[in-house]
Amino acid sequence: MAVKKFRSFDDFVPTISDSEEDVPDLDASDDEMEKKPVKSSKTKNKSKKKAKQQQGSHLDEDVHEDLNPEFQFSIDSGEVTTNFAGWDFQGDEKSDEVEKKDVDLDGIIRRKGGLIMMAATGSDAEESLSEESEEEPEEGDEPGESDDEDELALDGFGMGVKRKATEENEEDEEDEEEEDDDEDDDKKTEMSQADLGKGKDEDEDIEEDTKEEMAEFYAPEEESADAKKIVHKTFNSLSLSRPVLKGLGSLGYTSPSPIQSAAIPIALLGKDIIAGAVTGSGKTAAFMIPIIERLLYKPAHIASTRVVVLTPTRELAIQVADVGKNIGKFVNGLTFGLAVGGLNLRQQEQALKTRPDIVIATPGRFIDHLRNSASFSVDSVEILVIDEADRMLEEGFQEELQEIMSLIPSKRQTLLFSATMNSKIKQLISLSLKKPVRIMIDPPKQAADKLTQEFIRIRKRDHLKPALLYQLIRKLDNTSQKRIVVFVARKETAHKLRIVLGLLGMQVGELHGSLTQEQRLQSVNNFKSLQVPVLICTDLASRGLDIPKIEVVINFDMPKTYEIYLHRVGRTARAGREGRSVTFVGESSQDRSIVRSAIRSVEENAESGKALSRNVDWTQVEQVNSLIGAKGDVVEEIIEEEKQEKEILRAEMELRKGENMLKHKEEISARPRRTWFQSEAEKKNSKMLQVLAKNKKPINSKKRKQQEALAENPRLYKKTQKDRVEYQERQYSKKQAAYGKKGKKGKK
């Protein structure tokens, strides 16, 4: 049949792929030609509608079968992305296991009447009128400032600074406005001024590294000075390869930041670096770009881990991994591994077995994998990066960091980066640095240039802080279109504030250590996508996290140090954008010293933003506080209901765990026991030492010098028992003599 059909065409030459069905039958009538495609479409796709089948011709069907209707031609080269949405916080890929269920706190709040609509405290007209009448700008204000912001009166926070005559007049006006404060409050302010003066002397008395020590430890200053002088306007002048430039272009990076311009050439030379720059200046890319550039010349077909990046928090590690993947996505064969706590351990083991080129990790999970994961080693590590190095050198990470240093090859390049890099040489010696180049782009302990720092004096109104927070968020963002981060000191405070604000109708997320890693990542992603415009978190989120377009940072509780304050406010005003921070300031000397440091930094640097005092309508705040007080019983009910649901989930988890132990007993018992570099007793001791170190008062330079002298030159003569007895007798005779003098005075 096929041969007969092909013979009817004079010019047609059949091939092996041709079939009888593909050849059109020209002898058939037009009716038959119209019916055939309808029949074939019914047999192939029964789900198609009859109207589409009758309208579609044979040519249209061929087009739909051969081309994907969702295919689109890309006119752009794909190298530049202007609308970069930020880094990915998804972590590991989802496993096949059933996800753990969490308590639906928002559902409980809705059942109790929250998250329905915003609580109203008065009309917008009344609010605007009260704000305009109460928050008038003073004489010294700049014309560009808003009505509710005043130039920060330094004496108001205990600052003994010389002021002009006009400023003295302003101070008198402020005193008249604050006549309602009692004398005790004024006395407390004077006491805090004295405390601040003392604190200032102690800060100045802190011993710094001498010039001789710095010259011996660091590389010559000429190297860092030359690196700062050379300004690279584009990444092309840094002599980077095309795959790296293409990756930077896909992220929208056009010109390097000052820290990138200074650090990348030195890092490409293989030298050790200690670098510091303000938050949001691109420090992650400053070490990732030279690392990826050097890995382009790695030996082919030899899988080994050559780079280790250590970070203090899990979220920061996930973000650094995403930065590296985006920069190196056009580099062939470049692999990344993630080793952080809270995520699937088995998945991480499988990924590390492939020996990825770059491993980003937190210290604890990294040591766990080194000791217990097969086929993972760090014998070939060439580069070690410690991000947020000042935090990693503190008490909580010292022992883990020493263990990692003992396992990683000493012949390596070490890169240290942080926004507050003020670690002493004595701390850095343990890292085995080899003449590191010190690159400090900005003055130490400085905030971003376009950051406006605002301060609110709480005085004796600590109980009004939740109401003040609600009123402030409503005023700053009435449409829930801004991202606002609220920092608190305790996890319990973050959780309770979420419930209180939820009952007032505000959608709020929380981020702290009591949440599981899945919950933490979900909170960050919801905040990033503006599903939740307000994120209440502890200092867990104060370092490194780069979420685009965070407009406002609110310090509900004051941090312990000025360095932590800088990291907190550094979540906004990143990468040249404008930002605002609002801080609730108490009457303690610690709070005032942090404010004083912030103001001093603004005064010393002309381009370092503004420091303003924000006035508050406390009558409206008290109205909100009355609403919160009325919902006090509901808050306790929500906490109790959540606790009960958590207990049920925990019982279900224990039940599943017991079933698995019975079902897979042999397999579980056959697994090797996981080990750690510390015993249980050593773990407890280290935790106790950490707690004592946090509560320990800082010693002055005189005592520190005495302790260092004793440590370096211990006593050559050891006391005997006879010496101790004689010493006790002398002390006893002194006490008796002193007691006798007191007795004689009493008789007189």
Curated annotation (Swiss-Prot):
Pfam families: DEAD, Helicase_C. A motif (Q motif) lies at residues 233-261. One of its GO terms (cellular component) is cytosol. InterPro entries: DEAD/DEAH_box_helicase_dom, DEAD_box_RNA_helicase, Helicase_ATP-bd, Helicase_C-like, P-loop_NTPase, RNA-helicase_DEAD-box_CS, RNA_helicase_DEAD_Q_motif. CDD domains: DEADc_DDX27 (cd17947), SF2_C_DEAD (cd18787). Residues 264-439 form the Helicase ATP-binding domain. The keyword Coiled coil applies. Its EC number is 3.6.4.13. SUPFAM superfamilies: P-loop containing nucleoside triphosphate hydrolases. Keywords: ATP-binding, Coiled coil, Helicase, Hydrolase, Nucleotide-binding, Nucleus, Ribosome biogenesis, RNA-binding. It catalyses: ATP + H2O = ADP + phosphate + H(+). Residues 1-72, 111-211, 687-748 are annotated as: Disordered. GO terms for biological process: rRNA processing. The Q motif is unique to and characteristic of the DEAD box family of RNA helicases and controls ATP binding and hydrolysis. PANTHER family: ATP-DEPENDENT RNA HELICASE DBPA, ATP-DEPENDENT RNA HELICASE RHLE-RELATED. This is ATP-dependent RNA helicase DRS1. It comes from Kluyveromyces lactis (strain ATCC 8585 / CBS 2359 / DSM 70799 / NBRC 1267 / NRRL Y-1140 / WM37).
